[in-house]
Design a protein with these regions (language model features):
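N-terminal and secondary-structure boundary signal
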Residues: 2-304
Length: 304
């Protein structure tokens, strides 16, 4: 990977950063003409520095594991995780040794998945696709900080690892909805945690042990992104970003994604989210909880 393709956020030319300071890599792969599978391969191979898709996937998923794909389907067709991306992830997981019956695509409700174009299935031995309403939630409350929630059984009982598949978009209450906010779909009471622009609630949901220990990777779908009016689908505020964001650090990914959305808002003559009283301060709170880094100097943004 050439140095010309690497951007160290917040660092200046000539700055030598201490070798002991860990950096979180966020790959931003863009090509509006590329197939989802090709763009995914480029992003994954770049993120893990591997020569083949299978090698890349084996860095985060083991063949015998049960893998959950946490999509975002609230906006229906057009504003949800794309079918093409999910199909590409499923294909590569299987090539990396994960059995079809060990893959489950999930979201809050069957109805949401159906509206977004996903084919519901609970068939044994095949890729499953189901809402939390199928298996329900654990009976014991999970608590961290400001949050007390029941966690979806799909996550706790059907997944050894989770690939988080949010969408790159604005959120009318909490500012942005990407890696961190997408995990509201894993709890029974997400509507309770939107006050104060989601701070500290979004961070604390992600700090719940059942969630924190299972998230292996985030692949943020920026094929079509949205800079205003989210989380519902508002085509007048969409733009063809034509890319994917990949990271294992959800805080770093949200930091980069937030910057992308703010840049587009500036281009369109819109006020920054802070002036709209919905700055996503929960990102910094998540960093303080040890969920990742939001310091630009500790984020390696890799454009491919």
């Amino acid at each position: 990977m050439s140095l010309s393709r690497r951007i160290f956020l917040g660092s200046s030319i000539g700055t030598v950063l201490p070798a002991v300071a860990p950096k979180s890599r966020v790959v931003v792969a863009r090509d509006p003409k590329a197939r989802a599978l090709d763009l995914l391969d480029r992003a994954m191979q770049s993120f893990f520095d591997r020569n083949s898709p299978a090698e890349a996937w084996r860095q985060c998923i083991r063949p015998g594991e049960r893998v959950g794909l946490k999509v975002n389907c609230l906006a229906g067709r057009g504003g949800s995780t794309s079918l093409a991306l999910v199909e590409a992830v499923c294909e590569r997981l299987q090539q990396a040794g994960v059995k079809p019956g060990n893959i489950v695509i999930w979201y809050r409700l069957n109805e949401d998945l159906d509206r977004a174009g996903f084919r519901l299935s609970t068939a044994s031995g095949k890729i499953r696709c189901l809402g939390n309403d199928v298996l329900g939630y654990e009976s014991e409350l999970s608590v961290f900080g400001s949050v007390g929630s029941l966690v979806a059984k799909t996550l706790t009982q059907q997944c050894d690892a989770v690939i988080n598949l949010p969408v790159l978009k604005d959120h009318g209450i909490v500012g942005v909805t990407m890696a961190l906010k997408n995990m509201f779909g894993a709890i029974h009471n997400p509507n309770k945690y939107h006050p104060h622009a989601g701070d500290p609630y979004v961070a604390d949901v992600n700090a719940l042990p059942e969630i924190r220990r299972k998230i292996r990777l985030t692949i943020c779908d920026g094929t079509t992104a949205q800079y205003e009016g989210g989380p519902t689908y508002m085509p007048q505020w969409n733009w063809p970003f034509g890319g994917l964001l990949v990271a294992q650090d959800p805080v770093a990914l949200d930091t980069v994604g937030w910057r992308i959305i703010e840049q587009k808002r500036t281009e369109k003559g819109m006020k920054p989210l802070k002036e709209m009283q919905r700055e996503p301060a929960y990102i910094a709170t998540a960093a303080s909880r040890g969920l990742g880094v939001n310091d630009p100097a500790r984020i390696e943004r890799l454009e491919v």
